[in-house]
């Protein structure tokens, strides 16, 4: 029986490259030169931003988003936290979300059921397995999922026939 998995994954190597590109862009910008920094924690997928003022943090977030887009990483996975003061500096965290949580998985399964396709969807940890009798049914399910916005980038992998 044909099946595929719906996942939400980040390419960690591309993510590292995007942050490095953002650091280079920060050094190139005359208005931000020497006034801010990016610190990427690969373990917990967090980028710590430090600057002298709030408006500089906003500019740095835009630089980071632009670098992510250039590296073909969907910006929807970026969750920007509130900025806070730390001495004379302003700090802000940007967390990159990966994986499908239970709430999003339920939305995906519900959307597939609403579409009344001849497929079954089952939640398996941080992914959703979709099975059907025909490959065409699976392609319709993929089209239905791509048409709806879930707030997270979705990838389809592990096709089995």
UniProtKB/Swiss-Prot annotation:
InterPro entries, per the entry: DUF520 (IPR007551), UPF0234-like_C (IPR035571), UPF0234_N (IPR035570), YajQ-like_sf (IPR036183)
Keyword Nucleotide-binding listed: yes
Family matches, as Gene3D superfamilies: 3.30.70.860, YajQ-like, domain 2
GO cellular component assignments: cytosol
UniProt keyword terms in alphabetical order: Nucleotide-binding
Keyword Nucleotide-binding: yes
Single GO MF annotation: nucleotide binding
Family that this chain belongs to: Belongs to the YajQ family.
Protein function: Nucleotide-binding protein.
NCBIfam families the record matches: PRK05412.1
The protein, known as: Nucleotide-binding protein Pfl01_4421
Lineage, highest ranks first: Bacteria, Pseudomonadati, Pseudomonadota, Gammaproteobacteria, Pseudomonadales
């Amino acid at each position: 029986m044909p099946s595929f998995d719906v996942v939400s994954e980040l390419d960690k190597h591309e993510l590292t490259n995007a942050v490095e590109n953002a650091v280079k862009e920060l050094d190139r910008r005359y208005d931000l030169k020497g006034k801010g920094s990016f610190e990427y924690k690969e373990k917990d997928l967090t980028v710590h931003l430090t600057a002298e003022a709030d408006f500089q943090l906003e500019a740095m977030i835009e630089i980071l988003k632009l670098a992510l887009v250039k590296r073909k990483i969907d910006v929807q996975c970026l969750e920007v936290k509130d900025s806070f003061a730390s001495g004379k500096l302003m700090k802000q965290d940007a967390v990159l979300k990966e994986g499908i949580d239970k709430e999003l998985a339920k939305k995906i399964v519900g959307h597939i059921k609403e579409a009344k396709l001849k497929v079954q969807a089952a939640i398996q940890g941080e992914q959703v397995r979709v099975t059907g009798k025909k490959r065409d049914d699976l392609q319709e399910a993929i089209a239905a999922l791509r048409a709806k916005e879930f707030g997270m980038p979705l990838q389809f992998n592990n096709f089995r026939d």
